[in-house]
Amino acid sequence: MANTQKLISVLGDSISTFDGYTPPGGVYYGPSFGSITGVYTPEDTWWMQVIRALDGALLANNSWSGSTVSMVGSLPACSPSRIRKLAAEGMTPDHILILAGLNDVNMYAEPQAFGADYQRMLQRIREAYPQADVTCGTLTTGYLSNTPFTHQLGHVRDRLDPYNQAIRAAAAAAGYRLADIARLDRRYASMDGLHPNGEGMKQMARFWLETTEDL
């Protein structure tokens, strides 16, 4: 019997990294930090939990810590080089999960420019993988929970709305699915207001699955 599992790729920032599964040099989560983050294995990540729930298999994860969608930062997700790496081993994804943009907010990227680059990213994804389903996640932030860190990045929360509106508009224009996490107005357990801990990863996965259109 043919394998009917969906091949799923992920495009994102530090929230979607894990050592050995995402590009080296841009990793935030990994087993050596599990005692701090509560994220010990890739099975603890939001994206692997979503992939399992969709009865899928990971093809590629091109997520980089500190990366942006727009050209305001380094390694923008709209760049062709990152989009090319959503394929692997001669195979292309059936489904792509995108959760990116918090670093654009943190770096005060101009929302209109962010929206234009998000649209450009989706256009390039369509050109590279015309048969792929794509789900775009809106942005939310976390609350501090069981963390040794005192530095909180939750100030980003107050500036999310225009970026989320840009993501919604870009997904609608491209005809792609939206995981509108922001509309829930709920937060996840985090270490610093942005990076989920183990419990926060479970919450993020639930939020994603609860809000994704037409799964």
Positions of PLM-derived features:
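Residue-level signal for beta-strand positions within conserved beta-sheet cores that form or flank
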Residues: 4, 55, 130
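Extracellular cell-wall/glycan-interacting regions and their flexible linkers
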Residues: 1-5, 215
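Conserved SGNH/GDSL esterase-like catalytic core that processes O-acyl groups on lipids
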Residues: 7-9, 21-116, 161
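Short active-site segment of divalent metal-dependent hydrolases/proteases
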Residues: 15-16
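Alpha-helical cap/lid subdomain in secreted, periplasmic
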Residues: 78-215
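Short hydrophobic segments within beta-strands
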Residues: 11-12, 137
